[in-house]
Amino acid sequence: MIMKAAVYCGKEDLRVKEVPVREPEDNEVVIRVKYCGVCGTDIHIFHGDGGCCDVKPPLIPGHEFSGVVEKVGAAVKTVKPGDRVAGNPNDMCGECYFCKNGKEHFCENNIGVGTTVDGGFAEYVVLREKQVYKFSENLSFIEAAMAEPISCCLNAIDLCNVQMGSTVLVIGGGPIGMIMLQLAGYAGASKLILSEPVEEKREQALKLGATKTINPLEENVQEAVSYTHLRAHET
């Protein structure tokens, strides 16, 4: 089977090509992609910037995706063709020191969908069964494609111990910053502050629940948040 894909061929060289869809191994799932987000990592890859891994072209980027199961390997049991799914782009080895000590994010042998192996900027993507998660019809495909960035932000909320009454300062109003702002509000933060130079983003933040916005090009951020008694080490 042949599919169309956006293939990274080198610095600032992204081409739409027809490429074969890889047959799944026994523990793999072929997903027909419905939506795939464009992450900041994808932008860095396109511009040839150094990032979380050494990207070697040709490669299909994209790691924030949702879709429908098209085909499964012989040993797959948890999903079947037709299931609505989202994918975890990280395939940890489970065998290295970090994996065995609960620090999988430092896995020495991590396989990254869209960074070290082909990803979701394509009609189809192949993942291991353990990386595939079903979701209900109550969730749209475009919403499910946001599962990966939202999960990153949820982890940050936990690490920052955001709770009822917290004061939260978010630096930057890009997609991740806006998600963090909303999640902090859901976690109970009473003061939600965004530092962002772009006016449109500051206005959007106020619509999403920010209690104050700051233009760091015109204001001293530390002075602007002094009324909260927030300290630098708390941000």
Model-derived features: positions:
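Extreme N-terminal starter segment of soluble prokaryotic enzymes
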Residues: 2-4
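Glycine-rich beta-strand-centered segment in the early N-terminal region that forms part
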Residues: 22-36, 51-97, 136-139
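Mid-domain Rossmann-like dinucleotide-binding core that forms the NAD(H)/NADP(H) cofactor-binding site
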Residues: 139-219, 223
